[in-house]
Amino acid sequence: MAIPQIKTQVGTSKQAGDAAEESALRHLQQAGLRLLQRNYRTPGRGGGEIDLIMRAPDGTTVFVEVRQRANASHGGAAASISVTKQRRIIFAARHYLMRLREPPPCRFDVVTLECGVIQWLQAAFEAC
């Protein structure tokens, strides 16, 4: 008896996420930001990840979370960034900044992609 194979969307979801990140990167670069690092992760379990770390023309370090949704149901892409997710991003940002001799001014931006439309939310949340 043949066992039916179950198709997962892991590869498809990962590819869609990578494509969204690439679109966000191009959008930010066209706006004058420069890429410092991609997919920065803190070591160990329970840490955080930052999709893109950019430098704005004024010298501000910009930590960017990229979110993509096929449609705006369940609140859309921006609404999917929970307080817990924000804390993890802030944790990773602090970890990144500790490596620098003199930390620059920074902010947390979100780039959403919904139905092919890019929206850039500058200073979307703050580190308390």
From Swiss-Prot:
Any one Gene Ontology MF annotation carried by this entry is: nucleic acid binding
Signal peptide range in chain numbering: none
Coiled-coil segments: none
Polar residues compositional bias: what residue ranges? 1-15
Query: What ranges does the record give for the region Disordered, renumbered to this chain?
Result: 1-20
Q: Which family does it belong to?
A: Belongs to the UPF0102 family.
**What name is this protein filed under?**
UPF0102 protein Rfer_3873
Q: Which organism is it from?
A: Albidiferax ferrireducens (strain ATCC BAA-621 / DSM 15236 / T118)
